[in-house]
Swiss-Prot record:
It comes from Homo sapiens (Human). It is linked to Immunodeficiency 67: An autosomal recessive primary immunodeficiency characterized by recurrent, life-threatening systemic and invasive bacterial infections beginning in infancy or early childhood. The lineage of its organism: Eukaryota, Metazoa, Chordata, Craniata, Vertebrata. This is Interleukin-1 receptor-associated kinase 4. The modification N-acetylmethionine is found at M1. One of its GO terms (molecular function) is protein serine/threonine kinase activity. Its main location: cytoplasm. Keywords: Acetylation, ATP-binding, Cytoplasm, Disease variant, Immunity, Innate immunity, Kinase, Magnesium, Nucleotide-binding, Phosphoprotein, Serine/threonine-protein kinase, Transferase. Residues 20-104 form the Death domain. Associates with MYD88 and IRAK2 to form a ternary complex called the Myddosome. Once phosphorylated, IRAK4 dissociates from the receptor complex and then associates with the TNF receptor-associated factor 6 (TRAF6), IRAK1, and PELI1; this intermediate complex is required for subsequent NF-kappa-B activation. Direct binding of SMAD6 to PELI1 prevents complex formation and hence negatively regulates IL1R-TLR signaling and eventually NF-kappa-B-mediated gene expression. Interacts with IL1RL1. Interacts (when phosphorylated) with IRAK1. May interact (when phosphorylated) with IRAK3.
Length: 460
């Protein structure tokens, strides 16, 4: 006979069936991330850092539950059900808390299961009209996309733009990408790459090269969330046009998959060029400085227009034929009238290796973009990816700690593929990166200050 569950019961003693029920409540919308960042060591420090969270996240690809693994790992510290319930209530997971200790849950708490709540919210999500048009020249943008009206703070700050985007049919995009040929471009196919929310293909429209992003639902992303990101990308692009932001040409919403069509970026992403993908020559230090400044200019334009990108990373910094930096991928961007204030979201999104501590707690603030850009600056200096499980330290941002502890210097990490880097400007860029990576968001510079520091670096 099972023993009754009390506040002093160890979490590690909970049976598998109960853990599975808890996971059913917490796994959706990545609720486990909220718990993970709230768990502390006895010293008060965070028990789980970005790397730990990335490891839990990877379990989704194998069909496993991050919540189950989190509770198993935390359970090894002899935490109790009382500790867990306190954490669940603090994060408003009332339904799973009531499974464990019903009397501990406030009587006024809404214990609607999270999956039900998601369904209710999704039914109310606006989505764009699905217009069909025949193929016309890209420059004749006859079909316009009108962002859905909303009274929410996020959409209030977005005025409807008269910018016109072409509405492609899905059939047309299949034709111009050779039926979305999955073979890489290097072997004669059309596939340029893939990311968290879809695959990008090279296409040709009226003798113009374009990039077609076909959105696809990932393991932890619902179809409705994907539609919402499609919608958001178009809204941001309608509002924000700048030399250092990618240019959206059109979209397709009438077929099996949602698609976005962009101006083609012949030099790919900063991530690819830093890794010299496909045998491309390494970027010079001079070129890297130019790219850093361009990316900062793009982020500044977004922030000036009250938008927070939320997924700044080297893979989302694209390079045109002149290696001009173009910020891309605005599906996660948020807008707010109260831009200077921090707002909260139950949906924690972004790329873990670039995420600021507060972003992992669900806070939305422009200072999180600054933190992510700090990681990008480290990539520019070192030529190393933001995360590598076969490297020590595995997270690139942790080299800051090694340098501060005087175990190493930034010279130890400079990309040896460069031959024109001078120590003064490298140290200046590292200083900017270090400021951007401050644990406390209010101690980080704003993007205007980052721009100024980068300009001073190249002028000196």
């Amino acid at each position: 006979m099972n023993k009754p569950i009390t506040p002093s019961t160890y979490v590690r003693c909970l049976n598998v069936g109960l853990i599975r029920k808890l996971s059913d409540f917490i796994d959706p919308q990545e609720g486990w991330k909220k718990l993970a960042v709230a768990i502390k060591k006895p010293s008060g420090d965070d028990r789980y850092n970005q790397f730990h969270i990335r490891r839990f996240e990877a379990l989704l690809q194998t069909g496993k539950s991050p919540t189950s693994e989190l509770l198993f790992d935390w359970g090894t510290t002899n935490c109790t059900v009382g500790d867990l319930v306190d954490l669940l209530i603090q994060n408003e997971f009332f339904a799973p808390a009531s499974l464990l200790l019903p009397d501990a849950v406030p009587k006024t708490a809404n214990t609607l299961p999270s999956k039900e709540a998601i369904t209710v919210q999704q039914k109310q999500m606006p989505f764009c009209d699905k217009d069909r048009t025949l193929m016309t020249p890209v420059q004749n943008l006859e079909q316009s996309y009108m962002p859905p009206d909303s009274s929410s703070p996020e959409n209030k700050s977005l005025e409807v733009s008269d910018t016109r985007f072409h509405s492609f049919s899905f059939y047309e995009l299949k034709n111009v990408t050779n039926n979305f040929d999955e073979r890489p471009i290097s072997v004669g196919g059309n596939k340029m790459g893939e990311g968290g929310f879809g695959v990008v293909y090279k296409g040709y429209v009226n003798n113009t090269t374009v990039a077609v992003k076909k959105l696809a639902a990932m393991v932890d992303i619902t179809t409705e969330e994907l539609k919402q990101q499609f919608d958001q990308e178009i809204k941001v692009m309608a509002k924000c046009q700048h030399e250092n932001l990618v240019e959206l040409l059109g979209f397709s919403s009438d077929g099996d998959d949602l698609c976005l069509v962009y101006v083609y970026m012949p030099n790919g992403s900063l991530l690819d060029r830093l890794s010299c993908l496909d045998g491309t020559p390494p970027l010079s230090w001079h070129m890297r400085c130019k790219i850093a400044q361009g990316a900062a200019n793009g982020i500044n334009f977004l922030h000036e227009n009250h938008h927070i990108h939320r997924d700044i990373k080297s893979a989302n910094i694209l390079l045109d034929e002149a290696f001009t930096a173009k910020i891309s991928d605005f599906g996660l961007a948020r807008a707010s009238e109260k831009f200077a204030q921090t707002v909260m979201t139950s949906r924690i999104v972004g790329t873990t290796a670039y995420m600021a501590p507060e972003a992992l707690r669900g806070e939305i603030t422009p200072k999180s973009d600054i933190y992510s850009f700090g990681v990008v600056l480290l990539e520019i200096i070192t030529g190393l990816p933001a995360v590598d499980e076969h490297r020590e330290p595995q997270l690139l941002l942790d080299i800051k700690e090694e340098i501060e502890d005087e175990e190493k210097t930034i010279e130890d990490y400079i990309d040896k593929k460069m031959n024109d880097a001078d120590s003064t400007s490298v140290e200046a860029m590292y200083s900017v990166a270090s400021q951007c990576l401050h644990e406390k968001k209010n101690k980080r510079p704003d993007i205007k200050k980052v721009q100024q520091l980068l300009q001073e670096m190249t002028a000196s």
